[in-house]
Amino acid sequence: MAKKSQIVKWLKPKKYKVREYNRCRICGRPRGYIRKFGLCRLCFRELALKGELPGVRKASW
């Protein structure tokens, strides 16, 4: 979970649009970000395995 100070920092409006960057909505991780879901790969996997992401299934072939 992201620190309170980090969350407050992200919510403040940015002076310049270029300064915005992608972070996971759950844990705040900047790497392994999946744009379509707004999550990092770890949180995405966790939620997908629980069945909490609609339309996402584990691949098998």
From Swiss-Prot:
InterPro entries: Ribosomal_uS14 (IPR001209), Ribosomal_uS14_bact (IPR023053), Ribosomal_uS14_CS (IPR018271), Ribosomal_uS14_sf (IPR043140). One of its GO terms (biological process) is translation. Gene3D superfamilies: 30s Ribosomal Protein S14, Chain N (4.10.830.10). GO terms for molecular function: rRNA binding; structural constituent of ribosome; zinc ion binding. Binds 1 zinc ion per subunit. The keyword Nucleotide-binding does not apply. The keyword Calcium does not apply. Zn(2+) binds at C24, C27, C40, C43. GO terms for cellular component: cytoplasm; small ribosomal subunit. PROSITE patterns: RIBOSOMAL_S14. Its cofactor is Zn(2+). Binds 16S rRNA, required for the assembly of 30S particles and may also be responsible for determining the conformation of the 16S rRNA at the A site. Part of the 30S ribosomal subunit. Contacts proteins S3 and S10. This is Small ribosomal subunit protein uS14. It comes from Dictyoglomus thermophilum (strain ATCC 35947 / DSM 3960 / H-6-12).
